[in-house]
Amino acid sequence: MSKDEYKQNNQEKNNIIDNNSDEEEEINYNQLKGKPDTNFKSSSKRIQDNGHKLYIILEHANLELTKDKKNPEIINSDDHRNLIKKMNKSFEDFRPDVLHHCLLNLFESPLNKAGMLQVFIRTKENVLIEISPKTKIPRTIKRFCGLMGQLLQKYRIRAMNSSEVLLKVIKNPITQYIPFGCPIISTSEKSNTVKLEDYIYNLKSNNVAFVVGAISKGDVNIDYMTDTISISSFPLTAGIVCSKICTAFEKCWDVF
């Protein structure tokens, strides 16, 4: 397939997200944990893609709201240190900046701009989120946390002046949104190190899914992967792992 064919479905991105829409009824965060709206269907469920598609699943993301009913916020280790201490938890458990870094790298990649990337997030509270490739990720962590806080309360975020949904909470499990037979690869420092481009070529699959832990350190425990690999001899941040994966697929799939 030529480079032009890869890009023919890549439409101009809508860069404005409607953060002020009052169309959706606010939902208590306690109702959200692991219990997405049963009537809310994902547009990408059982995608049958005739071309190449990379699925990135960002696991164990640190997205948790404060209990303030009037103004709930995403808890982060910079602004809520006293709260985290009262919760008797580690500051490392509240790092939404790690997820933010991952998303910035993924959505600015040529692979995403070519329409060949689909991203999902699953939080440590087991909330599953689908993000449209057209979404413009906020540049600052403050705006990003505000956006994700609204999403966790309202289940979805729409584009400004459009009915198009850019971010939405969907039902578990994640595997129902990945094409049948698609390899699902997780990354771990403890696994055998591979040269990623060679590994991708040997998969011989148009659809591939990678699981990346959206955490500051350590591995994530999942039971749905088909293989686990290490992509570097050195410890890497989650954001750099996402960048390296996208770059490898861009080389293999001839995306410039």
Question: What are the language-model segments listed below?
Answer:
Residues 144, 170-173, 187-197, 202-218:
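Long, charge-patterned amphipathic alpha-helical coiled-coil/hairpin "stalk" segments used as oligomerization
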Residues 180-182, 206, 225-226:
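Short, well-ordered alpha-helix to beta-strand connector turns
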Residues 68-71, 197-200, 222-225:
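Short coil/turn segments at secondary-structure boundaries
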Residues 53-55, 209, 225-228:
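Beta-strand-rich binding-surface signature
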